[in-house]
Amino acid sequence: MTVFGMGDALGQLGLSWKKVMDTISPDQIAVFSGAAIGQLDVFGFGGLMQSRIKGSRASSKNLALGLVEMSADFINAYILGSVGRSGHNVGACATFLYNLQMGKEAIESGSARVVIVGGAEAPITPEIVDGFFAMSALSDDKRMIELQAQNNEDISKGPIQERACRPFGNNVGMVLGESAQFIILMEDNLALELGAKIYGSVPSVASHSDGYKSSISGPGVGNYITVARCVADAEKILGTKQLRNQTFVHAHGTGTPANRTTESHILNEVAKTYGISSWPVTGIKSFLGHSMAPASGDQLVTALG
């Protein structure tokens, strides 16, 4: 997945990677990428943990392929040959954003001129499904049928799988997805010098902790600060009128009842603070599912179009 995803990113760059390498030093490239949960399939930690139970032996590759930062290592070793900074910041389903923040800061500080930001995760394994099901986070057939009946939808043919994940309105849970998303950040002057195809910019990335709270997984004040800070930065760039009339939100929108209520409240409070009376909100997980680490990357690339 990493190789295919990174290959697609290079193909959309608008110039050859050789031209980039001929212009900058190899140590001016940084790569921040990885998974959130770790690969629990038979090739990674799954195979490692199951081998003794199955009466077989673990492969020498199981442990290495299960590590969360392996996608960055694959990019450095097999695709770019980079000798620059490399790393990965794990933050559950905000992992891509954490890496994006590191990438932005690396360019701003001058420690890198080109940064690869991404993530790859394949969380559809029995163990991960069981874990989320135990948390009542997953949509399942029984609850889907109940919701369809409640909404006066046809239940004669069973659950409507295409609508298993409903980020907005009445919903019963999320659907897992698999994804590999990579973007290439460049120093402004370098992008213009090389004639790279520019899709957008990253003027603001924020991440804040929640302070004291009784539940680690529950939302807290940090979520409000994070969104409000980015909206404030957007207002500085666009102006108040454009912020209020020409912006939209690409929401996390997992499809769980908890996310529906908490994220809606965050957006509503921030909108009131900045005088936004009507704020279009969309989400992509009803089509792609929740891919964990690359989830924010799914949102970013679909927003760019």
Locations of the language-model features?
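Conserved catalytic cysteine-centered active-site region
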Residues: 1, 39-102, 135-138, 142-175, ...
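Conserved beta-ketoacyl condensing-enzyme motif
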Residues: 1-92, 120-131, 238-260
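Active-site-proximal alpha-helical scaffold in enzymes
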Residues: 2-15, 68, 72, 86-121, ...
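Short coil/turn connectors at secondary-structure junctions
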Residues: 26-29, 58, 81-85, 110-115, ...
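Nucleic-acid-interacting cores, centered on viral/eukaryotic replication and modification enzymes
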Residues: 32-33, 104-111, 129, 133, ...
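Condensing-enzyme catalytic core mediating Claisen C-C bond formation in acyl metabolism
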Residues: 145-248
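Short glycine/threonine-rich loop-to-helix capping motif typified by GTGT followed
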Residues: 211-223, 253-271, 291-299
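A beta-strand-loop signature enriched in Asp, Gly, Thr, and Trp
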Residues: 230, 234, 238-250, 260-287
